[in-house]
Amino acid sequence: MIKALDEYVFREVCTHQRRWLDEGKKIVPISINLSRASLYFESVVKRYHDIARRIGIYTHLVPIEITESAAVDNDEIKSIADKFHGNGFPLLVDDFGSGYSSLVTLNMKCFDTLKIDKSLIDYIGDSMVRGCLCTR
């Protein structure tokens, strides 16, 4: 069911963007947060690419968000993330620093944006170590 919801949201975003373009409005990218369940199916990349193409939306207008834990946990998901990126979808890694932070994530070559979780910076000035990390 969650995969169907992910696809519904993706299709609705593409449809709205197409309508706004047709109305002459300036549009900005709207990112789609995909569930981990959707990322276990290699066909998801082709399916989403086909939806965007059929509706007439460039893939760079619908960035794909995945959580850091999903990106790091599984080589299969990393491969699918690479395929999204290779098909023109910007890739955002969400929740970086929410207890799962890893330099491995920073070595992922396919992501375009790293969204830092608020919990990583909440107390950044409260300790000398955190302050050093912030200023170096």
Go through each PLM region and give its residues:
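Short, solvent-exposed loop/turn segments at secondary-structure boundaries
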Residues: S43, G125-V129
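The catalytic core of metal-dependent phosphodiesterases that act on cyclic dinucleotides
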Residues: I51-I124
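Alpha-helix-loop-beta-strand connector modules within alpha/beta enzyme cores
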Residues: L133-R136
